[in-house]
Amino acid sequence: MQKSNIVEYKGLGRRKSSIARVKLVPGSGKVFINDRQPENYFPNKLVIQDMMQPLVLTKTAETYDVYVKVIGGGFNGQAGAIRLGITRALIQTREDLKTDLRKAGLVTRDSRVKERKKFGLYGARRAPQFTKR
């Protein structure tokens, strides 16, 4: 079996209940999410802008092709997971990008997740109505 000469950088991103496996390959700036264009995958442009933030910030949007496999969660969670995955893959390409990405707050994983429902309550915190008599 031959070993390929293609250089690829991988990053894993998580947000809420979404998990994104990102692969950066030197190329012309194409982006594929689950084998689809971002415009066909996400419902609006704001989510796509949020996802592409690390590439725009480091001016590498036209340098790498981005291939993403993402599962779980909704559109915002998936975009956040992809953003973190792209950030981690970019740090593998050049370590000096980490300071700029950290200043923009892109390196840290957003650990906020939905709070679980407790028994005796209607939701995580919503209690039944109190009756005095």
UniProtKB/Swiss-Prot annotation:
Highest taxon of source: Bacteria
UniProt GO cellular component terms: cytosolic small ribosomal subunit
Residues annotated as transmembrane: none
GO molecular function, one term: structural constituent of ribosome
Sorted UniProt keywords: Ribonucleoprotein, Ribosomal protein
GO process annotations (BP): translation
UniProt cross-references to InterPro entries, sorted A to Z: Ribosomal_Su5_D2-typ_SF (IPR020568), Ribosomal_uS9 (IPR000754), Ribosomal_uS9_bac/plastid (IPR023035), Ribosomal_uS9_CS (IPR020574), Ribsml_uS5_D2-typ_fold_subgr (IPR014721)
Xref: Pfam families: Ribosomal_S9 (PF00380)
HAMAP family, per database record: Ribosomal_uS9_B
Family: Belongs to the universal ribosomal protein uS9 family.
NCBIfam families (alphabetical): PRK00132.1
Identification of the protein by name: Small ribosomal subunit protein uS9
Organism listed in the record: Ureaplasma urealyticum serovar 10 (strain ATCC 33699 / Western)
